[in-house]
Amino acid sequence: MSAIDSAAVLAKIKFNADGLVPAIAQQHDTGEVLMMAWMNAESVAETLATGRVCYFSRSRGGLWRKGETSGQQQRLKDFLIDCDGDTILLKVDQDGVACHTGRRTCFYTAARPEGLTEVAKVQVSPDELYKK
């Protein structure tokens, strides 16, 4: 994806009081929902400029370039803003797994009549993923 001028995009986004907006990552060709994370203005601008998805890590208090540690990068295919301007949908090409648990998606726990059920298997050990 070519670099996108971020000024108009940033003007359209309604960041919360902490300067953040939720971002949903979806596999561009299958529609699989991979994860939800937060973005700030700087991470939005970097994502649009580089085509590599960058989030804001609330726990680390800084930019989180997806895949920087694990190698499991997300390449931006499309950047969509919802009707209220307060949520972003990132259509991405995900390298490997998206979840820090080693699963393809972070949405692997299903609420079923019999209780909570894990519906996705670990594909890569987290220890291997992060070389702990």
Curated annotation (Swiss-Prot):
Its main location: cytoplasm. It catalyses: 1-(5-phospho-beta-D-ribosyl)-5'-AMP + H2O = 1-(5-phospho-beta-D-ribosyl)-5-[(5-phospho-beta-D-ribosylamino)methylideneamino]imidazole-4-carboxamide. Mg(2+) binds at D82, D84, D86. InterPro entries: PRA-CH, PRib_AMP_CycHydrolase_dom, PRib_AMP_CycHydrolase_sf. The keyword Iron-sulfur does not apply. Its cofactor is Mg(2+); Zn(2+). GO terms for molecular function: magnesium ion binding; phosphoribosyl-AMP cyclohydrolase activity; zinc ion binding. Pfam families: PRA-CH (PF01502). It is found in: Cytoplasm. Its EC number is 3.5.4.19. It comes from the Bacteria. Zn(2+) binds at C83, C99, C106. GO terms for biological process: L-histidine biosynthetic process. Keywords: Amino-acid biosynthesis, Cytoplasm, Histidine biosynthesis, Hydrolase, Magnesium, Metal-binding, Zinc. Gene3D superfamilies: Phosphoribosyl-AMP cyclohydrolase (3.10.20.810). One of its GO terms (cellular component) is cytoplasm. Binds 1 Mg(2+) ion per subunit. Binds 1 zinc ion per subunit. Pathway: Amino-acid biosynthesis; L-histidine biosynthesis; L-histidine from 5-phospho-alpha-D-ribose 1-diphosphate: step 3/9. Belongs to the PRA-CH family. Catalyzes the hydrolysis of the adenine ring of phosphoribosyl-AMP. Homodimer. This is Phosphoribosyl-AMP cyclohydrolase. The lineage of its organism: Bacteria, Pseudomonadati, Pseudomonadota, Alphaproteobacteria, Rhodospirillales. The gene is hisI.
